[in-house]
């Protein structure tokens, strides 16, 4: 997801462009929280799916007013759909607590589904054992 796509997603969730600083701040808060709570906590899972024992989460680059629209959000693809929901939660937090709560609930539901999928045992083969 690019910065432009994220902005469009946040707009689709009802937030307008009147205050770009709020959109930028909300996006940065969402990206940082997802990195700290989901990406780092599930490093082994991402190492496995990327088949890279050296995989480490990158520290996300902070979005600013100068950030190019084509800038790719630095969150693993599996978790990227969480970013607009959490950013919308933060964007609405001061103005409309009901909307903020609704987006938090949607974020939390999707997050729980993704976490359950990440901790579900992957395909495994068992070899050996005791013969009769």
Segments and roles (model prediction):
Residues 1-72, 113-132:
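Conserved short "hinge" loops at termini or chain/domain junctions
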Residues 72-82:
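Structural motif
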Residues 81-94:
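Short, hydrophobic/amphipathic alpha-helical patches that form generic packing surfaces
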Residues 95-101:
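Charged, low-complexity interaction regions
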Residues 103-106:
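Short, surface-exposed beta-strand/strand-loop-strand elements in extracellular ectodomains
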């Amino acid at each position: 997801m690019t910065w432009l796509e994220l902005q469009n997603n946040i707009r689709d969730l009802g937030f307008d462009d009147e205050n770009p600083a709020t959109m930028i701040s909300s996006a940065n808060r969402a990206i940082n929280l997802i990195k700290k709570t989901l990406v780092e906590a599930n490093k082994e899972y991402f190492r496995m799916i990327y088949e890279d024992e050296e995989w480490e989460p990158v520290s996300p680059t902070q979005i600013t007013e100068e950030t190019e629209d084509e800038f790719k959000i630095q969150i693993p693809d599996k978790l990227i759909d969480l970013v607009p929901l959490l950013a919308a939660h933060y964007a609405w937090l001061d103005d409309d607590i009901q909307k903020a709560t609704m987006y938090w609930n949607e974020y939390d539901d999707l997050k729980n589904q993704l976490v359950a999928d990440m901790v579900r045992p992957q395909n495994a083969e068992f070899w050996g054992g005791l013969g009769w």
